[in-house]
Curated annotation (Swiss-Prot):
Gene3D superfamilies: 1.10.287.3510. The lineage of its organism: Eukaryota, Metazoa, Chordata, Craniata, Vertebrata. It catalyses: a ubiquinone + NADH + 5 H(+)(in) = a ubiquinol + NAD(+) + 4 H(+)(out). Core subunit of respiratory chain NADH dehydrogenase (Complex I) which is composed of 45 different subunits. One of its GO terms (molecular function) is NADH dehydrogenase (ubiquinone) activity. Keywords: Electron transport, Membrane, Mitochondrion, Mitochondrion inner membrane, NAD, Respiratory chain, Translocase, Transmembrane, Transmembrane helix, Transport, Ubiquinone. GO terms for biological process: ATP synthesis coupled electron transport. This is NADH-ubiquinone oxidoreductase chain 4L. Core subunit of the mitochondrial membrane respiratory chain NADH dehydrogenase (Complex I) which catalyzes electron transfer from NADH through the respiratory chain, using ubiquinone as an electron acceptor. Part of the enzyme membrane arm which is embedded in the lipid bilayer and involved in proton translocation.
Amino acid sequence: MTPLNINLTMAFFLALAGVLIYRSHLMSTLLCLEGMMLSLFILLSLLISHFHMLSSSMAPLILLVFSACEAGVGLALLVKMSSNYGNDYVQNLNLLQC
């Protein structure tokens, strides 16, 4: 394993630990999830370029699109929670009703 792969894997697990540790506020959880998705994007891009798998070259782009959609939905939830409750605690997510 190259040092770049080790660093990216470590970045993924540090972001995962951030999700588990800082799960009280939605903003910090969303930032850690974005870190996880970006490290997965870079690892997947490096894996595809290293093994010359041209058949799955669209996979990193699809992952990036889903990451952007996840960020948009998360920020919409953050705005809705902030306007309703005045804070961004994750425990308020189960209180949101249509």
